[in-house]
């Protein structure tokens, strides 16, 4: 008996407080799981432990779903904007989170890094969610923009789905 290898993709939209994650079957182009990952409650005080907790959870999900490909959104350099994020150190914290997640590459066949502009161009989050709303509501009952249930999907989860959609279908 020949067993076909599964091609599974984890798409990730990180932030310093939580992150959006989606897992796909690349062969069938089906979304298998979407989730908002929070740090474990006892990890909320230390930024580094918080990042490690989220990264560890991604590793567990990748084992459960036998993920062998990842695509991770990484921050862009803010030449003009982003003063508040720069002053509070948020960008450095986000880079730390991304670095921990990127280390998953050693257990993956591929690990792609994308910038926000790289996968959605200049498109605002709301426009991206509106573009995907009908398809993802019909297939998975995911309310990307809040029009079907008045409860909008978390932006990190929405972006994780968008990143995976971009990787699998080539555009948003």
Task: Describe each region flagged by the PLM.
Residues 1-172:
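Phosphate- and other anionic-substrate recognition elements at nucleic-acid/protein interfaces
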């Amino acid at each position: 008996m020949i067993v076909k290898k599964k091609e599974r993709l984890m798409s990730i939209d990180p932030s310093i407080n939580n992150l959006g994650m989606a897992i796909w079957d690349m062969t069938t182009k089906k979304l298998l799981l979407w989730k908002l990952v929070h740090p474990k409650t006892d990890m909320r005080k230390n930024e580094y432990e918080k990042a490690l907790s989220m990264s560890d959870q991604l590793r567990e999900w990748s084992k459960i779903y036998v993920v062998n490909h990842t695509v991770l959104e990484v921050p862009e350099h803010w030449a003009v904007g982003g003063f508040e994020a720069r002053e509070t150190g948020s960008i450095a914290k986000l880079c730390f989170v991304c670095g921990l997640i990127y280390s998953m590459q050693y257990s993956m066949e591929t690990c792609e890094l994308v910038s926000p502009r790289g996968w959605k161009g200049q498109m605002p989050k709301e426009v991206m969610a509106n573009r995907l709303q009908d398809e993802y509501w019909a297939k998975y009952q995911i309310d990307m923009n809040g029009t079907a249930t008045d409860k909008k999907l978390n932006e990190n989860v929405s972006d994780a789905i968008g990143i995976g959609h971009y990787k699998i279908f080539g555009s948003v």
